[in-house]
């Protein structure tokens, strides 16, 4: 068959366990192609973290290959109504069919639940495709006798399960990790991720080490699941399936790493917040390229040492990362020094309003919470091989949703 490169709309939102109105979904998701409203992307990929609900059988038939619907949770039998799916579906054109809806996690825990067993919602991946795209995938599957979709769940969290329930092993709770879908017809692996967060009083290098350990587990799980579907064998699976990593990867900005500077509203927070309050986009872009930890890690891996001033600044031996992690991270960040938005986290929930709709330079009137240093944990990373075939037409953040301490992000690729 002729090689097929569908246009992509990729989006991510950490929902903070809250719902979303149809108007907000319309504004956010209609960035599918803001300049050509009648030319919609072929694939719509939506990553959600701390999503308040998970998919259920009302979405469609789960027995067939498309749509693929799955939830990994101890509470599947007592789920609340899934308003999120209906909100998103109603915001899209009738040209779209549901391709996959996969989630893992637990519903948001009630207030007062101890932190060691408290859940904030599900990690979720929802994929819609235009009808002719689905037809292409079906034709490919029949010709090559391959599955249309390969779902992968990779829990990496440390939460304790609910009492008397042990559906997941120790240190593999589904509050952190990735839900993934590989599409053999396109040779792509889409991962919706939520990695380890940050606590005060410790430098980011400590948490980066945890995040890279989590990425290694995710990469290993993906390799095992994909090895029999790639002609190059287990050690090459993540080279054959080109990664699209999207979600709350939780890498942060850090100027002052000393523990005494990491307190709530402390020196590190103030140094970053002062730049943001000036409202100068050039200064914000310089802040991103100089102090965003993920930007530095990816630069170091790409340029063999350039990024951090010293490898010790990274907090881990990047050269010693397993090959599968390096394969997973052969990606291009859609946020670059020249198009990055103002930080997407951490805002005061429910306060302020946006001063512009969506653009690379949009700045919210919402205040950043002193709880954490303002950062760009929400990211869209696309395989470098794919970026040679795709142009990133636009990317940005939607500051109109105030129900979460994050704002949604998006990228349009064609």
Residue ranges and their predicted role:
Residues 1-126, 158-164, 201-211, 215, ...:
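N-terminal, active-site-proximal structural segment of metallo-dependent hydrolase catalytic domains
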Residues 86-91, 119-140, 181-185, 334, ...:
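Conserved beta strand-loop-helix elements of the APE1-like EEP
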Residues 118, 144-147, 160-162, 172-173, ...:
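Metal-dependent phosphoester-hydrolase catalytic domains
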Residues 168-186, 196-198, 211, 220-224:
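Extended serine/threonine-enriched, polar tracts that run as long, contiguous segments within proteins
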Residues 16, 51-52, 194-196, 249-252:
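Catalytic metal-binding/acid-base residues of hydrolase active sites
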Residues 10, 46, 128, 181, ...:
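Structural signal for hydrophobic/aromatic residues that build the beta-strand cores
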Residues 1-10, 121-125, 129-138, 150-153, ...:
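Beta-strand-turn-beta hairpins that frame and shape the catalytic cleft
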Residues 19, 33-37, 55, 88, ...:
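Eukaryotic basic, amphipathic alpha-helical target segments in cytosolic regions
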């Amino acid at each position: 068959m002729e090689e097929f490169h569908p246009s992509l709309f990729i989006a991510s939102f950490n929902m903070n366990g809250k719902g979303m109105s149809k108007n907000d979904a319309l504004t956010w998701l209609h960035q599918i192609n803001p300049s050509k409203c009648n030319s919609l992307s072929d694939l719509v990929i939506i990553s959600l973290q701390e999503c308040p609900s998970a998919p259920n059988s009302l979405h469609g038939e789960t027995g067939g290959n498309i749509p693929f619907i799955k939830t990994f949770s101890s509470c599947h039998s007592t789920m609340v109504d899934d308003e999120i799916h209906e909100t998103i579906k109603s915001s899209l054109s009738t040209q779209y069919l549901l391709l996959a809806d996969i989630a893992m996690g637990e519903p948001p825990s009630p207030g007062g639940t101890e932190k060691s067993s408290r859940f904030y919602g599900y990690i979720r991946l929802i994929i819609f495709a235009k009808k002719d795209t689905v037809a292409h995938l079906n034709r490919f599957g029949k010709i090559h006798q391959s599955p249309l979709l390969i779902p992968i769940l990779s829990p990496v969290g440390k939460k304790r399960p609910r009492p008397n329930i042990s559906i997941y092993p120790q240190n593999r709770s589904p509050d952190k990790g990735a839900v993934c879908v590989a599409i053999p017809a396109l040779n792509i692996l889409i991962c919706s991720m939520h990695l380890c967060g940050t606590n005060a009083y410790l430098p980011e290098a400590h948490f980066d080490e945890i995040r890279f350990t989590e990425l290694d587990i995710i990469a290993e799980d993906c390799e095992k699941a994909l090895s029999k579907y790639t002609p190059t064998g287990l050690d090459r699976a993540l080279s054959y399936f080109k990664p699209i990593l999207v979600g709350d990867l939780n890498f942060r900005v850090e100027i002052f790493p000393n523990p005494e500077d990491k307190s709530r509203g402390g020196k590190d927070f103030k140094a970053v917040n002062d730049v943001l309050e000036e409202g100068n986009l050039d200064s914000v872009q310089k802040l991103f390229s100089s102090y965003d930890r993920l930007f530095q890690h990816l630069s170091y891996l790409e340029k063999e040492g350039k990024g951090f001033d010293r490898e010790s600044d990274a907090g881990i031996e990047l050269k010693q990362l397993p090959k599968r992690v390096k394969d997973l991270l052969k990606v291009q960040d859609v946020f670059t020094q020249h198009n990055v938005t103002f930080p997407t986290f951490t805002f005061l929930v429910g306060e302020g309003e946006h001063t512009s709709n969506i653009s690379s330079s949009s700045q919210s009137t919402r205040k950043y919470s002193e709880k954490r240093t303002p950062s760009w944990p929400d990211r869209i990373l696309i395989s470098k091989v794919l970026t040679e075939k795709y142009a990133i037409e636009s990317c940005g953040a939607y500051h109109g949703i105030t129900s979460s301490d994050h704002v949604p992000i998006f990228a349009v690729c064609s």
